[in-house]
Amino acid sequence: MPRGLELLIAQTILQGFDAQYGRFLEVTSGAQQRFEQADWHAVQLAMKNRIHLYDHHVGLVVEQLRCITNGQSTDAAFLLRVKEHYTRLLPDYPRFEIAESFFNSVYCRLFDHRSLTPERLFIFSSQPERRFRTIPRPLAKDFHPDHGWESLLMRVISDLPLRLRWQNKSRDIHYIIRHLTETLGTDNLAESHLQVANELFYRNKAAWLVGKLITPSGTLPFLLPIHQTDDGELFIDTCLTTTAEASIVFGFARSYFMVYAALVEWLREILPGKTTAELYMAIGCQKHAKTESYREYLVYLQGCNEQFIEAPGIRGMVMLVFTLPGFDRVFKVIKDKFAPQKEMSAAHVRACYQLVKEHDRVGRMADTQEFENFVLEKRHISPALMELLLQEAAEKITDLGEQIVIRHLYIERRMVPLNIWLEQVEGQQLRDAIEEYGNAIRQLAAANIFPGDMLFKNFGVTRHGRVVFYDYDEICYMTEVNFRDIPPPRYPEDELASEPWYSVSPGDVFPEEFRHWLCADPRIGPLFEEMHADLFRADYWRALQNRIREGHVEDVYAYRRRQRFSVRYGEMLF
C-alpha cells in the first residue's frame, strides 16, 4: 500500500459519517412538518428510513474504500495508522463520539466482525472525558416567574415553533399550574423556574416539550406532551414531573424520538437512572448506543467477580438466554435446533427482531442490540452455562482456548419474567400486573403487532412495573392473522374429541382459546375476566384489524390514563 493512503481512508470514513449524519438531521428536521400535517404514516416511514440510513452509508463507505485500495489486503500496521489519522481528525470535530462508532461499523463490515481489538477499534473513546460533559451551545432557555406562573407558561407556549391553533391555551396553562401546585406547594412553586429545551421532541402523534423544573430542593423533569384534536387544534394532555415518569417516556421499549444528539448531556440531569447508552438509544442514535452499551458491559465485567449463568425463568424453545447476576442486561442466542412445535428458521427469528427494531414499539416491546462474533472469557462462564451453550448452540460457538466466540447474539434490557412476577405478588400489585398485561396486548394490537405466543413467560416487568413483550419469534402483523370464532359443536361428542371438529388453516387464531392458559390460575382468571374479557372475542380483534386497514393510527401514551388532564381536571372550567 502506498504511504499517505491511510489519511485518505481516514478522511473518506469521516466524510461518509458526515453524509450519514446530515441525512439523519434532514429526516429529523422534517418532524415538525409531519406533526403539523398530522401525516402519521409519514411519521412511521421516517422512523424506518432514519434507522436504515446508518447501514446504508456504512455500505457506501465500504465500497469507496475497496475502490481506493483496489481490493488489496491490508496488514495490521496499516490499519493502526488509519486509526491514528482518524483520531487526529476528531479533537475539533463536534460529533466525535458518534464518528468513532461509525469508524467501528466500517471496520466491522470490512473485516466481517473479526479481529475486534482495542488497538484497531474505538472500543473506548480516544477523546478525554471532559468532552463528553461539555454542552457545545445553549440548548435550552430559562423562564422565571417574575409576573407569575400564568405569564411564564404563556411565554413558554408562545415561544413554541408550532403553527397550528390551540384548542384552549388558557385552560391548559391552568391545568399545568394546578398540577405544579399540587406537586410542589404554592410557596415552592413561587421560588421555582423553568429551563426548556429549544427543540421539541417528536414521537408518534405527539410533540413533547421537555424541560427542567428547577426548585429550591432540586431539579425535576418537566414534560408536556402536545397532541392534536381531530380538528387539528393543539392541546396539552398532561404534565409529568417525576424522574420515574420521565424514565418511562424515554424508556427502552419505546420508539426513538426525532431530536438532535447534542441534547444527550443536557437530558442527563432529569434522567439520572438512564445510562449513556439508553439516552442515545432514546433519540435514535442506536448504533452509538450499541457502542456505549458494550462499554458499559466491559466496565461492569472489570469490576465484578460474577460468572454468566442461565437467566431465570422458563427455558425458551428458540432462544438460550443468559446473564450476569448483577447486570441489568440479558444475552440471547438463537439455538441450533428449535423445539418441534416451533416450525421456523433462524433467519425468520432474526427477521422478527429486525421488524421490532423498525416498528413502533409503543412502549411494549423491548429494544435489542445485535452483536456478531461476541467474545467471552471462559473464566466468566459458569460450568452449567458452558455445558448448555455447547448443547444448544454449538454451531454458533468457536473455541479459542481461554475464550469462546459466539457468532451472533442479542443484548436486551433485563426484566422480571411476568410469570415469576405473578407468582410473587398479590393484592393490588397482582391486579396492576394483569391490567398492564392486557393493556400491553391491546397497545401492541393497535400498532398492528400480534405477539403470537401470549403466554405470561414471554413478557417481562420493568423496574417501573410496566409489562413489556420480549419474545419475538412468533410475532407478525395483525393484518396477517385470521381471527375466527370456534364453530358450535356438531354433536355433544365433538367437545370431548382429541381433534377439533373444524378446519384450521395457517394464520388462523381462535381468541376463545386464550382463556385456557391465561385464566387457568384461580387468582388471575377473575381479574382477567373483569378487565380484559373482550380479548377472548374474535370480533374485538377483527374490529382492530378494520381500523388498521382503514389507515387509522392509534394514540400512544407513555403514562396512565388517570394522569391525563381530561381525566384529572376534565370538569373544571377556566
Swiss-Prot record:
The keyword Nucleotide-binding applies. Keywords: ATP-binding, Cytoplasm, Glyoxylate bypass, Hydrolase, Kinase, Nucleotide-binding, Protein phosphatase, Serine/threonine-protein kinase, Transferase, Tricarboxylic acid cycle. The active site is at D367. GO terms for cellular component: cytoplasm. The gene is aceK. InterPro entries: AceK_kinase (IPR046855), AceK_regulatory (IPR046854), Isocitrate_DH_AceK (IPR010452). One of its GO terms (biological process) is glyoxylate cycle. Belongs to the AceK family. This is Isocitrate dehydrogenase kinase/phosphatase. NCBIfam families: PRK02946.1. It is found in: Cytoplasm. Its EC number is 2.7.11.5, 3.1.3.-. It comes from Shigella boydii serotype 4 (strain Sb227). GO terms for molecular function: [isocitrate dehydrogenase (NADP+)] kinase activity; AMP binding; ATP binding; phosphoprotein phosphatase activity; protein serine/threonine kinase activity. ATP binds at A311, P312, G313, I314, R315, G316, M317, K332.
